[in-house]
């Protein structure tokens, strides 16, 4: 599943390097790891930030990939 989606960052713990995104379509919150964030800056997200992402099935369930801040 590589369809691009948008959503809001529900929360992100920069110290632990992960958080969750609430998809705009109302589907279940999606796990996001800092390594999935695109960009050259410090890879973190802010609560309430708009993002675009795709979903892939990981070992522990669906996770966001190719996350881009909007």
UniProtKB/Swiss-Prot annotation:
Stored InterPro entries: Cold_shock_CspA (IPR012156), Cold_shock_domain (IPR050181), CSD (IPR011129), CSD_CS (IPR019844), CSP_DNA-bd (IPR002059), NA-bd_OB-fold (IPR012340)
Gene: cspB
Name of one Pfam family that matches: CSD
Subcellular localization(s) per the UniProt record: Cytoplasm
CDD domains linked: CSP_CDS
Keywords associated with the record: Activator, Cytoplasm, DNA-binding, Transcription, Transcription regulation
UniProt protein name: Cold shock-like protein CspB
Positions of the CSD domain: 7-67
Gene Ontology molecular function terms on file: DNA binding; nucleic acid binding
Biological processes, Gene Ontology terms: regulation of gene expression
Gene Ontology CC annotation, any one: cytosol
Gene3D superfamilies: Nucleic acid-binding proteins
């Amino acid at each position: 599943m590589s369809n691009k989606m948008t959503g809001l960052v529900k929360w992100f713990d920069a110290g632990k390097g992960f958080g969750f995104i609430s998809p705009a379509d109302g589907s279940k919150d999606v796990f996001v790891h800092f390594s999935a964030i695109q960009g050259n800056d410090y890879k973190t997200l802010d609560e309430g930030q708009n993002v675009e992402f795709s979903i892939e099935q990981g070992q522990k369930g669906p996770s966001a990939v190719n996350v881009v801040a909007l």
